[in-house]
Amino acid sequence: MTDADTLVVEFEVRAPVSQAFRVWTERAGLWWPKGHTVSGDPESIVFEPGVGGRIVERGRDGSEHEWGEITAWDAPRQIGFLWVHVFDRSQATRVVLTFAEVGTTTRVRLEQTGFAVLGEAGAVRRERTWNAWGVVTSAFARAAEAEEG
């Protein structure tokens, strides 16, 4: 973590950049931890490609839970999004994921900003979010490394 408004998570994935980006944006429903979803057992998690696309959890009962909106799409190098997830849109933060080639691996940098708008509650949210991203990014790394090219 860096300051009160920002958190940064960096890690390496033993997979090419294009594969890592694809697993994050096209296969999230296969690896995203169920305990970090609205429904607890979604049918799918979709990152609609391109700026303005939605991030949507689709429940097995046909329900949709909008997690956010794509604000930047530079495949396979970067994706940015307004992150609502389980909160009210007025409490949204911004996330930017950058995928950089480092030899035969991919360095992933996740930067999330906007916690300060929540006032005193921002520090608590940031700490919980930091812990949640640890679980989510570990699951992602395992999936990206297991994915067939």
Question: Where do the model's predicted regions map?
Answer:
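Hydrophobic ligand-binding cavity/cleft-lining segments
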Residues: 1-42
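Aromatic-glycine hotspot motif
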Residues: 2-18, 58, 93, 101-109, ...
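Conserved short-loop catalytic and cofactor-binding motifs
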Residues: 8, 42-43, 58, 121
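Conserved strand-loop elements at the edges of beta-sheets that form or border functional pockets
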Residues: 13-15, 49, 72
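Hydrophobic pocket/interface hotspot
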Residues: 20-21, 55, 70, 79-81, ...
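Hydrophobic-ligand binding "helix-grip"
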Residues: 31-32, 45-46, 56, 60-104, ...
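A conserved amphipathic terminal alpha-helix motif
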Residues: 113-149
